[in-house]
Amino acid sequence: MPLPQTGAPGPEVKSPREPRKSQTLPVTTWKSNSMKEQSVHHGGSLRPSLGMLKQTLFRTSLRTSTHKPKEDPGLFRRSSRFLFRSLRRAIDEGLTAGHPQGPAVPEKPSKVTDGVSRQAATGTEAEDLEPQAESKSVADLITERQLVKAFEQLRYLETQLVADKTSRTFTQDPTAYARRAMDLCLHYDGMAAEIGAIVREALSSEGVDRDALAELAQVVHLEEEAHQTSQAEGDFLSTPRHWRMHWEDAVRLSAQESVQQAGAKVIPGAAEGSSDLAQLLAELGGVVRHDLQKVRLEMQPAYEATDFPVWETYLRAFHSAVAQRLQELARDARGCEQLYVLLDWAANVYGSPDFLGAPDLALPTEPLPPLLEPALWARLESDYTSFLETKITSCFDSILQLEQNRWEADEDREVLQGLYHAPLSIDVHMLVAEHVKAAGAISAELEATTLQICARALCLFVPRFEKAFLASKAVSEWYLGAYINACVELRTSLLARFPGTIKELEKPLVAATNSFQKHLLQIVQQDMQPLFKVLYTKSWLTQDTLRPLMDKVVDFAHHLEHVTPPLAQETLQEVHRFVVREYLGQVLRPHERFSGQDRLKGSNKMNLDAQAISNTFQGLGSEAKWLDQAILSVAEILGETYKDDIRRHLETLIRSYPDIRRDHILAILALRRLGRRRNQNLLQHTQDLLRAAHETRLPSHHVLFEEIEVPTSVDVLITCI
């Protein structure tokens, strides 16, 4: 749109206030100050217009932006917006002053590139520029980063231009005001761009130009004092330039550039492994640490003469940049390992008091916001636990496969600290402890969740392992003892390390322990069972048939020496009870019945066997002394010559073993071969004793006769009759 022209065609109209002198910017070679006004050929006349000025401002700003890369493009847009508002206002003032719009006046275009507005437009004489010509131009001062001197000159020119505008010097030629105002605006923008360049170079270069930083801080302070209040709407002269905000923006941009360049060659999402992401985060931490140390130790002292919050501003800028980078990495994180590396770095590396390498440089927790938003943190933890559940299940599968490989390879038996040892307990304990400890390093909530995941997986693994082992060909005293030890160790170690948190593990581990112990007993029982058949026979009276049986017991006890003591003692007592029970069962179910001298010999033989059994098990460490009286009591009844004392022996037997039944008494009396009347009296007497014994028997009382089956024979029936 063409600019309104004043006056009729003819000579250029002079300013009505010619004595007022004005000064323009000197000739300069600075790029942002070089701007050639476009000539618009239309009908043989040159018409400066708003469109021409917009194009000129755009090209000049573009050249400046290419000279100073990565500066805020909004800076020039804001300045141009103020400029054209002011230009409109100047035009309106010219119209209201009584200068109607008329035909265009041919005017020789002014060259803004030389920094000097033509004197015909303002009435300024050439000698007024001599003080400026003797010194450096504003552009040169900016280029040389003499920002204070450059600002003082710009401030002087700005004050003069405001005075000229107030005195309506530009009433008849508002474009002259626009040219000078545009030149001022571009130089102010150039200073702002130079401030951004100084900030960027301070962080990216190896050294620190403290003089430039001090100059920057001083010129920002001077600008804030000079431009304290905003002007009327549409007037951009003498308005605050907000260079402090521009400095803060430059700090943020430089921090973002530094953080984004860290680990740029690493592609963490290329695979599910954690090594690439860990390398990237290590590089990121190193960059942040180096830059913040540089800020604190080298850059902050340069600002010490001003009130610039250097450390706080850079700290917030880097914190925000790191948070943004982590959010980007979180979107691409894959698998359990990468998620954990990300969470661990945020919680333990970046949040560590010695992250910056010195206690006095520790990152404060306040007033910085969380590095990761709570919602994002919760999502990462949820994703991590989902992957973790699958991973832990897979780890238990691998442990089972390793044990199966050992069974097939029949590896050498291992004894650790005197006990049979299988790697099972160590593998499981390390698996649980490692993941729980790693999760605890991130948060207490994640630790509790991980512990529950491990407990559930272990509860499912133990029965699977038990079933797989018992179905294999590796079942033996050594493996059974080793796995009993493993279950006991897991119970004690896990429950001791994580008390009250994984009680559900108690049930499957106890069940597996009992199962392995049961199969261990079955092995020795099956091995000894045939040796009981020769007891209470004719050959038994004259031969030492008990020794092979005791040899089996001693051999088995050697295995129990390598089983954890509580279970070893319990198993040994079970073997002791098994021997006494099977011995009595063989006596009460005899293949042959003795009378006379053979019965007495049998009684003596039973006494000797009872003593040998008791001595053997006591020598092995059995604490089941309550079993010693069983065989002796039956032997005394069979060998008692004074029949009235049989009643006393029966009373002792019933009191010692309250689980004895009436059919057991009948079987014993049948072996003794007493008369009918005496048998009836003894049965009548023992009936009351048996009833009282059953009534007073405790649930925890030992069991012996209850497990001995006595078939009804002719002799027993005769005894009953």
From Swiss-Prot:
GO terms for biological process: exocytosis. The modification Phosphoserine is found at residue 515. InterPro entries: EXOC3/Sec6, EXOC3/Sec6_C. The keyword Phosphoprotein applies. It holds the Pfam family Sec6. Residues 22-37 have a biased composition (Polar residues). Keywords: Phosphoprotein. Residues 1-52, 94-135 are annotated as: Disordered. The keyword Cytoplasm does not apply. GO terms for cellular component: exocyst. Gene3D superfamilies: Exocyst complex component Sec6, C-terminal domain. Belongs to the SEC6 family. This is Exocyst complex component 3-like protein 4. It comes from Mus musculus (Mouse).
